[in-house]
Amino acid sequence: CSTEILSLSPASLREMALESLPPWPDDMVLSGTNEHGQKILHEGEFVIALYEAMPATIDVAIPYTYDEYVLVLEGSVVLTSTEGVRQEYQTGDQFLVPQGWTGTWEMPGRFRELIIVETDQWEASDSLLAALFASPPKAGSSAPAVLPLLANTLQQAELDSLPPWPEGVVITGTNAHGQKVLHEGQLVSVLYGAEAALLEVGAPFPYDEYVFVVEGEVFLTSKGGSPKTFGVWDSFLVPEVW
């Protein structure tokens, strides 16, 4: 797989052509148009894909088999859990649907999203139809809830201090940073913050890292390459071994 930074510009992602998917089974579509498509953008430790659906309400009666991170690129969606918890997300919002979730997805207009799913789970399902083949929930298990990841809330969240970077990592600036773990499952979702600094990434990245910028900006320069700039609302992927 590529070792280059993958820019995920919302404007480009909204215009990208997708490949048609087989229709959902009829009993899953409560109302609307049974038409959708996807495009895989990256496949490494996790899969990044674009997904689009026409206006419809989808019944997810069988539990999700995987954690799914979602960034809404176009349209809006109303998620209502089997327990009756209703959440609405608009363009630019993010959320995480946890493994085991059930409920309905209501998409009042054309809906496009960027999604991230752990690769082994994606390959086991081979498509977004994975939820159809899940095992039923265990009796007495608590219902998992969708985790909102709204930028205005994340900007205000308190972080836990991290130990300073080792000597030699910080070229200039302040060696102070912190994080807060928001979700730990098949995917780990973490809020990270740092003071102004220039860091040297001398050892290759040990993992794929998807980044959504909620405050400030960052300049990434590959060895021998030109800098790439990302600001608030931008997202990108730092691939393993970068």
Residue ranges and their predicted role:
Residues 34-35, 44-64, 99, 175-177, ...:
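Conserved short histidine dyad/triad with adjacent acidic residue
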Residues 86, 91, 99-124, 231-232, ...:
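Ligand-binding loop in jelly-roll beta-barrel domains
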Residues 2-50, 126-190:
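A short, N-terminal "cap"/entry segment at the start of jelly-roll beta-barrel domains
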Residues 62-91, 202-232:
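A short beta-strand-loop-beta hairpin characteristic of the jelly-roll/cupin
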Residues 12, 31-33, 80, 88, ...:
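Threonine-centered tandem repeat motifs in low-complexity domains
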Residues 50, 64, 74, 81-82, ...:
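Residue-level recognition of conserved beta-strand positions in structured domain cores
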Residues 56-57, 121, 134, 138-139, ...:
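Short S/T/G/P-rich N-terminal loop/turn motif that feeds into the first structured element of a domain
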